[in-house]
């Protein structure tokens, strides 16, 4: 039986001029024709068998299946084609108009089937009372929550508490939320903390721990008030900020009187070489060893090591350049030693000096 079908297809391909009317069943990457016509290919295959192969199926080398019809009606309904010892009865091929009518009938049939199925679904939803019964909950919603365990008066009480109570957060209040006694107490704590810290000074983080305030803005407001209090009262102390530290210092106007009390002379541990290196770092920070050497024209390693031991400079990371050299900046101790609050108070360099002759380090 399979051989008969193959012979029939071969004869048709060799002898018949196939029509231009084609219906393509393309591969998955190009199935626009199939989607446009919305055909049931299984149904069409059945139709081919029922009509004695009136529509011919041909598979090409590219594995794309196509359906062809014959446009030329030169063949009679009972014309015979001889192939070897076998004679095959060939029915008359369909015309283009017949093919279109056939496709249209398939679409109409499919549409009718869809309408019948839709009508069946609509009939199922006709009974609204049955639908309401299915959607109705098994228990009343109010009955579930109206139990004896819930007291209505307690519920009202809870709502009143939520409405009248104010929620406070640790960092939600400002200086205006503190009364005068609280502000005075905080100032007293700051005074004691500054006295104990001495020349080391205290940072904002230290004051947060002692005062219990968590906002830097709150502390700065109270520190400004405390500084004004010292000025108004003509106190012998002054509150000054050096870098990130706050310190209590004596008034400069009392310098002569205090010099009679302090008779010890202090010797600086810095040589000329170390002072020059420290000055270069202060004016160019953050800076590298190579830049210091380019300015001084000498190897700065001994001076850098000495300044690190004296805690006058610190390592502040590495530069994002080849080799990743270490960056150096001045430390908090630098501000304390030279009485500088910030880098803007450094003496301005004289740009008119064209030559710089450092002291010979052989004497140091």
UniProtKB/Swiss-Prot annotation:
Keyword Cell cycle: yes
Disulphide bond pairs: none
Keywords, sorted A to Z: Cell cycle, Cell division, Chromosome partition, Cytoplasm
Pfam families listed in its UniProt record: SMC_ScpB
Source species, domain of life: Bacteria
Key word Cytoplasm present: yes
Gene Ontology cellular component annotations, sorted alphabetically: cytoplasm
A single BP term in Gene Ontology: chromosome separation
Subcellular location: Cytoplasm
Principal location class: cytoplasm
InterPro entries per record: ScpB_csome_segregation (IPR005234), WH-like_DNA-bd_sf (IPR036388), WH_DNA-bd_sf (IPR036390)
Family classification: Belongs to the ScpB family.
PANTHER family from the UniProt entry: SEGREGATION AND CONDENSATION PROTEIN B
Function as written in the Swiss-Prot or TrEMBL entry: Participates in chromosomal partition during cell division. May act via the formation of a condensin-like complex containing Smc and ScpA that pull DNA away from mid-cell into both cell halves.
Subunit structure: Homodimer. Homodimerization may be required to stabilize the binding of ScpA to the Smc head domains. Component of a cohesin-like complex composed of ScpA, ScpB and the Smc homodimer, in which ScpA and ScpB bind to the head domain of Smc. The presence of the three proteins is required for the association of the complex with DNA.
Name the record gives this protein: Segregation and condensation protein B
UniProt organism field: Ureaplasma parvum serovar 3 (strain ATCC 700970)
Gene that encodes it: scpB
């Amino acid at each position: 039986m399979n051989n008969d079908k193959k012979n029939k297809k071969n004869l048709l391909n060799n002898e018949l001029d196939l029509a231009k009317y084609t219906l393509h069943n393309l591969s998955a990457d190009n199935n626009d024709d199939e989607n446009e016509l919305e055909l049931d290919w299984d149904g069409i295959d059945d139709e081919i068998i029922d009509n004695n192969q009136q529509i011919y199926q041909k598979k090409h080398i590219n594995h794309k299946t196509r359906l062809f019809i014959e446009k030329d009606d030169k063949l009679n309904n009972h014309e015979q084609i001889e192939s070897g010892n076998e004679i095959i009865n060939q029915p008359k091929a369909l015309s283009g108009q017949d093919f279109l009518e056939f496709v249209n009938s398939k679409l109409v049939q499919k549409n009718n089937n869809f309408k019948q199925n839709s009508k069946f679904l609509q009939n199922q939803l006709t009974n609204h009372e049955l639908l309401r019964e299915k959607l109705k909950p098994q228990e009343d919603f109010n009955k579930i929550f109206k139990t004896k365990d819930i007291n209505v008066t307690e519920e009202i009480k809870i709502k009143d508490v939520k409405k009248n109570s104010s929620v406070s957060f640790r960092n939600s209040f400002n200086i205006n939320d503190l009364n005068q006694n609280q502000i005075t107490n905080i100032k007293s704590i700051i005074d004691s903390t500054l006295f104990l810290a001495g020349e080391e000074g205290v940072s904002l983080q230290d004051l947060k721990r002692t005062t219990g305030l968590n906002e830097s803005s709150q502390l700065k407001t109270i520190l400004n008030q405390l500084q004004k209090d010292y000025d108004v009262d003509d106190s012998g102390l002054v509150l000054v900020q050096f870098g990130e530290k706050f310190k209590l210092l004596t008034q400069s106007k009392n310098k002569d009187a205090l010099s009679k009390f302090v008779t010890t002379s202090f010797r600086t541990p810095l040589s000329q070489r170390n002072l020059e290196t420290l000055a270069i770092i202060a004016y160019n920070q953050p800076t590298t060893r190579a830049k210091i050497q380019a300015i001084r024209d000498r190897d700065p390693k001994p001076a850098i090591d000495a300044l690190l031991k004296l805690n006058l400079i610190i390592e502040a990371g590495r530069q994002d350049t080849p080799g990743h050299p270490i960056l150096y900046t001045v430390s908090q101790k630098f501000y304390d030693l030279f009485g500088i609050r910030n880098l803007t108070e450094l003496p301005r360099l004289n740009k008119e000096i064209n030559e710089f002759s450092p002291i010979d380090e052989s004497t140091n």
